[in-house]
Regions:
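Short beta-to-alpha linker loops that shape the active-site pocket of alpha/beta-hydrolase fold enzymes
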Residues: 56-61, 66, 122, 269-270
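Alpha/beta-hydrolase
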Residues: 137, 143-226
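Conserved acidic catalytic loop of the alpha/beta-hydrolase fold
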Residues: 73-91
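Conserved hydrolase catalytic core segment
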Residues: 88-132
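Conserved HGGG/HGGXW glycine-rich cap/lid loop of the alpha/beta-hydrolase fold
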Residues: 10-62
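Conserved alpha/beta-hydrolase "acid-adjacent" motif
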Residues: 244-250
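Catalytic active-site module of serine/aspartate enzymes centered on a nucleophile-bearing elbow/loop
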Residues: 260-297
């Protein structure tokens, strides 16, 4: 099953990893991104008895576009997918841009979601502007999504063409062009296996078009239409202290306002926490344990 048909006629793409009979956890990718998380399977989630359900958001991968969507609209899609899969209760993980959507689901679906993890998560912008401490390259992308979307679209189209036509050149350029990243992040963009996964992930993100790569940054920069302090379910906040893509200082100031949040700040780590096996294991373990406190699984 690669796609689920929704009541409004749209489809949502998904990939499943780990223990398919295990505790269900929905995974929300970054921006841009796709459901493709692993080249094959995830031995860690399988070992922990977790059924990892990775979804494409509208316009990415196999999911149909949803014009004028909001962050909170995603909760309705997730609820319908869970119903289709006959899953009554579950947890959610949102990474980077996906953190906004995990937070929105936690706010909207407290009767269905047992626990949530915000990993390297973006935070609400003030007056629609990215934080001053954000990496310059990321700030430029947000600026272009609002002011010069045609230029950002051309950039993503060029990237897509490179992946399709000259994958080895893409790998070479990626290795050379990541000097702006923290060293702990650069190490995950070095091997052929890592770069192959990145290419598949990004190719799926732009499978239909590059339009959502421009729309979603703009969406994230606008009002989320809910307040993080109104989230009532257990939340784990995971963040690298050296993260500049989603600046650590921002989540550090917001996390104390989330009533049932536990913070896990990783020393000498950047943005790609889910690529660190020990951290990924801890994220899943904590999420499952906090869910078990809510209801017997």
């Amino acid at each position: 099953m690669d796609r689920i048909h929704l009541q409004d006629g749209r489809h949502i793409g998904l990939s499943q990893y780990g223990d398919l009979e295990g505790f269900p956890v929905f995974f929300f990718h970054g921006t841009p991104g796709s459901r493709v998380m692993f080249l094959d399977d995830d031995p860690i989630s399988k070992e922990l008895g977790i059924r990892l359900i990775s979804l494409d958001r509208p316009g990415f991968g196999l999911s149909d576009p949803q014009p004028n969507r909001t962050i909170l609209d995603w909760a309705k899609d997730v609820q319908e997918v869970a119903d289709h899969l006959d899953i009554s209760h579950f947890s959610v993980i949102g990474v980077s841009g996906g953190g906004a959507f995990a937070a929105g689901c936690a706010y909207q679906l407290p009767d269905r979601i047992l626990s949530a993890a915000l990993v390297s998560s973006t935070t609400p912008f003030q007056d629609g502007k990215p934080p001053k401490s954000m990496l310059k390259e990321n700030k430029i992308a947000f600026f272009l999504s609002k002011r010069m979307p045609w230029l950002l679209k051309a950039s993503y189209r060029a990237q897509k063409k490179l992946i399709e036509k000259k994958p080895e050149k893409f790998k070479k350029l990626t290795k050379k062009g990541n000097k702006h990243l923290h060293p702990s992040d650069r190490q995950f963009l070095q091997t052929d296996e890592q770069l192959e996964l990145m290419m598949r992930h990004l190719y799926e993100a732009t499978r239909q078009s590059v339009d959502e790569c421009i729309h979603e940054p703009d969406l994230l920069s606008r009002s989320w239409k809910f307040d993080m302090k109104d989230i009532q379910i257990p939340v784990d906040v995971w963040h690298g202290k050296e993260d500049q893509m989603a600046p650590f200082e921002e989540i550090e100031s917001i996390a104390p306002n989330i009533p049932n949040a536990k913070t896990h700040y990783i020393e000498q780590a950047g943005h790609f926490l889910t690529d660190i096996d020990d951290v990924w294991r801890d994220i899943l373990l904590s999420l499952k344990k906090r869910a078990e406190h809510q209801v017997h699984i």
